[in-house]
């Protein structure tokens, strides 16, 4: 079911009801950052990506006719860290442009939590696996250097599939120590370094990502959320810290 109206409240309700400590969102309208953070009791780190010139005008058009403007509203990578969770909020925010120019500007949000966990949130180039591979490898090099010895969660829409782009995932493991993927044919992934996996990344089942409107099922995104759970084996600040993450 498709409706031509703003769905910010529905996104906020679904995200707030889910269980997580850190959430990584891509292609998120920039105006959603504050309402989502408030609804979830979270601190936010927003990194703008593409199509964000004249942002106020784009946002106004999106409120009036979301279907007409669609992704032309502008985008961002948004990382949310629940202040009351085991990660203790956000201690440091950085961002890095990982792809300049055509086809689109791509950025990565780098977030260090108060518990010491580092989070890299990115959206790699679409429809061009060679560009996506370059984006992801550049991002992994920067993220691991920035994180140092701290545990790292590296995730987002990588636009790479392990069954077709296996060499890239092997390089991520060998060069950067980043392991784990969602499924062989998936493009949304949560990879980890220095974390003990409790529940490996997996897609939400279809019914979990649907809401009911007028007796019909409405999906808020064409991407199924991915969630996983890890333990921080040596938390720098908190004892028995864990990470429950979703993208």
Model region roles, listed by residue range:
Residues 76-78, 105-109, 118-120, 187-189, ...:
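Short beta-strand micro-motifs in enzyme catalytic cores
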Residues 127-143:
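Alpha-helical scaffold elements lining the catalytic groove of polysaccharide deacetylases
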Residues 3-8, 101-104, 132, 136:
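A conditional alpha-helix N-cap/helix-loop micro-motif detector
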Residues 4, 28-115, 203-205:
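Structured beta-strand-rich core segments of catalytic domains in phosphoester-bond hydrolases
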Residues 11-36, 119-122, 138-166, 191, ...:
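Active-site beta-strand/loop signature of hydrolases that rely on acidic residues for catalysis
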Residues 1-7, 56, 125-130:
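Acidic/histidine-rich helix-loop elements
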Residues 88-91, 97, 130, 144-152, ...:
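Metal-dependent phosphoester-hydrolase catalytic domains
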Residues 93-101, 120-132:
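Surface-exposed cleft-lining segments at the edges of enzyme active sites
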């Amino acid at each position: 079911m498709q409706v031509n109206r703003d769905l910010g409240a529905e996104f906020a309700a679904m995200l707030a009801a889910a269980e997580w400590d850190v959430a990584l969102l891509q292609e998120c309208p920039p105006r959603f950052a504050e309402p989502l953070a408030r609804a979830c009791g979270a601190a936010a780190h927003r990194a703008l990506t593409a199509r964000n010139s004249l942002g106020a005008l784009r946002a106004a058009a999106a409120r009036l006719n979301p279907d007409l403007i669609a992704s032309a509203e502008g985008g961002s990578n948004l990382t949310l860290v629940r202040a009351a969770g085991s990660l203790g909020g956000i201690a440091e925010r950085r961002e890095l442009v990982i792809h300049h120019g055509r086809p689109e500007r791509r950025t990565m949000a780098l977030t260090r939590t108060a518990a010491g966990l580092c989070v890299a949130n990115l959206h790699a180039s679409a429809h061009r696996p060679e560009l996506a591979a370059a984006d992801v490898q550049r991002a992994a090099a920067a993220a691991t250097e920035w994180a140092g010895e701290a545990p790292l969660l590296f995730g987002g829409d990588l636009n790479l599939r392990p069954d077709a782009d296996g060499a890239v995932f092997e390089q991520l493991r060998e060069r950067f120590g980043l392991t784990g993927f969602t499924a062989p044919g998936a493009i949304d992934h949560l990879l980890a370094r220095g974390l003990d996996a409790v529940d490996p990344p997996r897609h939400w089942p279809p019914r979990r990502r649907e809401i009911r409107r007028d007796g019909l099922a409405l999906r808020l995104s064409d991407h199924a959320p991915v969630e996983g759970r890890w333990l921080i084996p040596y938390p720098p600040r908190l004892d028995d810290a864990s990470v429950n993450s979703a993208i």
